[in-house]
Amino acid sequence: MLGALSVATDGGARPLVLWNRTASEPEGLYVRQAAPVRIGALVAFQVPAPAFPYADRHMSYLRRVPVLKTVAAVSGDQVCTGDDRLVINGEVRAPILKADRRGVALPRWNGCRQLREGEVFVFSDRIPNSFDSRYFGPVNLAEIVGVFRPMALSRPQPGDR
């Protein structure tokens, strides 16, 4: 099973604890913390509207659970997705895949612009096929349900946060 499982909430839709079962971030239990959304922060959010049709058909677990990803760029940063690669502030970060491992076409955010106030770009370089902002574009801060930190990882690895 893949996905982040919300196991406790604050009485609303904002989870306090998440169980991440995807390889794009270390597998394990994460707890929400009072921390700013900044580069390097792990944030949880619902699948953005541009990605929902693909996610609904091919990643149905995301209907129920938030996505957990690392913030790679914030307001003022330049993000480009041309030439089948992600470039942030002039640095090539990763390729952009045309299809998933089943051969299904992935959605794609096409753009080259400075992120606006209230936007972040999320990205994981832990696996080559992470479903992140390369495919659905910037995430609005209003869509973020929290900043999370690892509480108990299943398989800690060097470099894990």
Where are these regions (language model features)?
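Protein maturation boundaries and topogenic segments
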Residues: 1-66, 114, 137-161
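A short, sequence-level motif marking secondary-structure junctions
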Residues: 35-37, 95-104
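Solvent-exposed loop/turn segments at secondary-structure junctions
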Residues: 36, 51, 79, 86, ...
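Structural motif
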Residues: 41-43, 77, 119
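Mid-length scaffold segments of soluble, non-membrane domains
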Residues: 62-95
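Acidic loop->beta-strand submotif enriched in PP2C/PPM serine/threonine phosphatases
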Residues: 103-117
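Phosphate/adenylate-binding glycine loop and adjacent helical scaffold
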Residues: 124
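Active-site loop architecture of trypsin-fold serine endopeptidases
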Residues: 130-135
